[in-house]
Amino acid sequence: MAPISFGLGDLVVSLPIVQALIADSRRRGDETWLVARSSSQARLSERIPGLAGCVDEEAFPPVSGADRVVDLRDHPLQRDYWWGSPEFEATFGPLYINEILERIASDFGIEADFSAPTPLLSSPLPGLGRTVLLVTETDGPAKVWPATKWESLAGQLRQRFDVRRVTRTAAIGDLDPLDVPALPVPNPGAAVDALSSCRGVIGIDTGLTHIAVQQQTPTVTICRHGSVYFRRWSHTRALRGAPCDAACSAEERASAYNDRVSLRDFQWRPRTCPSGQRCLAELQPEQAARLFDELR
């Protein structure tokens, strides 16, 4: 099974379909393998219970007649539209990722359950029971929330919680731009353990925040107005920015790659917001804190 794209979060939101295929394969005495579209997806696959293994998309061989390949990109709902775009909403309405993938799964004949997340395998980390973790880093510069907002949010939360931010590497000396104690998670498995063990998570719309949601950890996602990746469950809330302006929408449309099925040799380039992320900059720490209090 190949997920909807190459990001860590793209695999996480695809998990209900992966898990349904694993359950079906087990009943039939077969195996389910993941076709990983990035190294981070391959590393996270080790935490998916029942998965037989993982193969890199770049090295994926042609399948034999008895094998079945489910490629979630190979569907008109994916190929013909950029999710969250005005054209998409005009055709389908304001669908979120669970509703989109449920339709794709149904067309593939897969009975996937999107009613609640089934957590990844994890090992508890001691000492995080009263810790709120902040997910501030993202590979997409168009999704950045200002450091001053994160520091203000951390200050408000410290009155009641231990507060740390998840980082993929340890900061060196004075190179750390954010004055919040760091919790390094050097690989996806370590991130799963930390995000499963903490009191809650407030994070930008990125892979680690999606992992927290998958682990049923109370999570507030800070996202752009048109993001479809928020998953609406009782333990989740979304703090959405203002609608994107015309320049931002045009830049996003120009960088869309939804018409590609295979991502072999695809070179993704981070998209920079031409408007300086004004939509997220207007969001206030107090708003995030209030949403988090709804989940306590």
Located regions from the model:
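Short beta-strand/turn micro-motifs composed of small residues
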Residues: 3, 36-38, 73, 136, ...
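Conserved catalytic-core segment of nucleotide-activated headgroup transferases in glycan assembly
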Residues: 11-24, 139-166, 281
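Nucleotide-sugar donor-binding patch of glycosyltransferase catalytic domains
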Residues: 213-296
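Short, aromatic/basic amphipathic alpha-helical patches
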Residues: 40-52, 174-180, 232-234
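Short acidic-hydrophobic, aromatic-tinged amphipathic segments that line or gate anion-handling sites
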Residues: 53-58, 182-185, 237-242
